[in-house]
Amino acid sequence: MEEIKLYGVKIDNVTREEAVCRALRATGEPCVAFTPNALMLERARKDTALATLLNRASLSLPDGAGVVWAAEKMGMPLRERVAGIGFGSEILERAERSGLRVFLLGGGDGVAEHARENLRKKHPRLCICGATWGYFQKTGEENASVISYIRACRPDVLFVCMGFPVQERWVIENLHLLSDIRVIACLGGSLDVWAGDLRRAPHWMSRMGMEWLWRMLRQPKRFAKLPEIASFLWHVPPKAEFTEKSPL
């Protein structure tokens, strides 16, 4: 499968349909899906350990207009933006039709449970076999208890929504204990949307790649991240300069 690299982080050049099919057809070890956006890539640019972490994914989806813009500027156009929540929603639809079992992990107190209730209303035949919050100790007995609960529920699909880089690090550190799961996807704030605590951007804004603006307007604390996003966009070299130098 074709891929590009931005600041040392691989990005799969896939459509959402291709990403979903690849994830659900995984055999052997789990398909681990990460969704790098501009903020994540900027932090990976400054911290090679984060770049290494992101590269542990078996599927790396270009989540965000900034990533698509950067790839275009560098002469490596991506076929489309694959938003994490869109990828997750499509997985849920396929899971309902195929009888796959889904586990929801993340969010604050009650968020995963509310998301499960809402998703069951939208997908009556969907089997959400378990749900629990993400604010637990990531080591020791509490972590072991959460993993035991997940394993006991026997999910085919695990959505981990605890924010970057906590969710990615937790998945990689515990992957050997989750080897029976077919798809493990890190989806950030998707549970908050499915729970009804956060509205998704209107379709026209999503189509124009302006979901980032919508999230900032709904959550003003996100404005503090603007300098990092601006830094990412500033450091992207134009195509000519990129061609003359070694790949990022």
Please report, for each region that a protein language model flagged, where it lies by residue:
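Internal alpha/beta domain cores that form substrate/cofactor-binding pockets in large enzymes
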Residues: F103, G107, V111-L119, L126-C153, ...
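N-terminal nucleotide/polyanion-binding subdomain common to many enzyme families
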Residues: M1-G86
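A transmembrane-helix-recognition feature enriched in membrane-embedded lipid enzymes
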Residues: G66-A71, R200-L248
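Hydrophobic alpha-helical segments and helix pairs
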Residues: V68-L105, D109-G110
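Short hydrophobic/charged patches on amphipathic alpha-helices used for structural packing
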Residues: A51, L92, A144-S148
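Structural motif
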Residues: A33-T35, L61, V157-C161, A185
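Short, compositionally biased "basic patch" segments
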Residues: R56-V67, G108-K121
